[in-house]
């Protein structure tokens, strides 16, 4: 009903607009032709002209899948020396993470014994050695606790984890000790 209430004077004003007013903005004429720009493409279909490493790398051997159990981060490396362990713990402390020691007496490697659900990343549950080391500022304290755990459980896998108490997540985890034969 509102459309029927427009006066005839308004209709006359709309009809009086000149064609010059409708063309005040220049129309979009599109992008420029690609032929206006110089072409610098190399017309070579030879596959050997693609990226190369200069022939420095030939065939690389893959990691043998048999007899190599995966434990934790850095498990593909040889066992860490006490100096290397101290450097890892120093990194953990510099990152403001809380060090904690955990041990496992049966299977220190990844398995799906308890659950195949994706709720826990590998189905393992480790026992905590004492409490997390809140307030620890020196890697020697952590390594001393590692030695105490080794004396108490010589046949256990022992790992050091770094816990971020702000985000409440485990940020780092690596094997610090493996029993003989692993």
Swiss-Prot record:
SMART domains: RuBisCO_small. InterPro entries: RuBisCO_ssu (IPR024681), RuBisCO_ssu_dom (IPR000894), RuBisCO_ssu_N (IPR024680), RuBisCO_ssu_sf (IPR036385). Residues 1-58 form a transit peptide. Keywords: Calvin cycle, Carbon dioxide fixation, Chloroplast, Photorespiration, Photosynthesis, Plastid, Transit peptide. The keyword Transit peptide applies. GO terms for biological process: photorespiration; reductive pentose-phosphate cycle. GO terms for molecular function: ribulose-bisphosphate carboxylase activity. GO terms for cellular component: chloroplast. Its main location: plastid. It is found in: Plastid, Chloroplast. It holds the Pfam family RbcS. Heterohexadecamer of 8 large and 8 small subunits. RuBisCO catalyzes two reactions: the carboxylation of D-ribulose 1,5-bisphosphate, the primary event in carbon dioxide fixation, as well as the oxidative fragmentation of the pentose substrate. Both reactions occur simultaneously and in competition at the same active site. Although the small subunit is not catalytic it is essential for maximal activity. The basic functional RuBisCO is composed of a large chain homodimer in a 'head-to-tail' conformation. In form I RuBisCO this homodimer is arranged in a barrel-like tetramer with the small subunits forming a tetrameric 'cap' on each end of the 'barrel'. Belongs to the RuBisCO small chain family. This is Ribulose bisphosphate carboxylase small subunit, chloroplastic. It comes from Gossypium hirsutum (Upland cotton).
């Amino acid at each position: 009903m509102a459309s029927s209430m427009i006066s005839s004077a308004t209709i006359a004003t709309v009809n009086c607009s000149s064609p010059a007013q409708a063309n005040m903005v220049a129309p979009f004429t599109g992008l420029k032709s690609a032929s206006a720009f110089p072409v610098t493409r190399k017309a070579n279909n030879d596959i050997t002209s693609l990226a190369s490493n200069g022939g420095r790398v030939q065939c690389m051997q893959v990691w043998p899948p048999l007899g190599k159990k995966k434990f934790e981060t850095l498990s593909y490396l040889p066992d860490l020396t006490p100096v290397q362990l101290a450097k890892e713990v120093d990194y953990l402390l510099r990152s403001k993470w809380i060090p904690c020691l955990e041990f496992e007496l049966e299977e220190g490697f990844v398995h799906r014994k308890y659950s195949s659900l994706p709720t826990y990343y590998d189905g393992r549950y480790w026992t905590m050695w004492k409490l997390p080391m809140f307030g620890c500022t020196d890697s020697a304290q952590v390594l001393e606790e590692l030695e105490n755990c080794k004396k108490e459980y010589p046949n256990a896998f022992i790992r050091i984890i770094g816990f971020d108490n702000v985000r409440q997540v485990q940020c780092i985890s690596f094997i610090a000790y493996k029993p003989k034969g692993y």
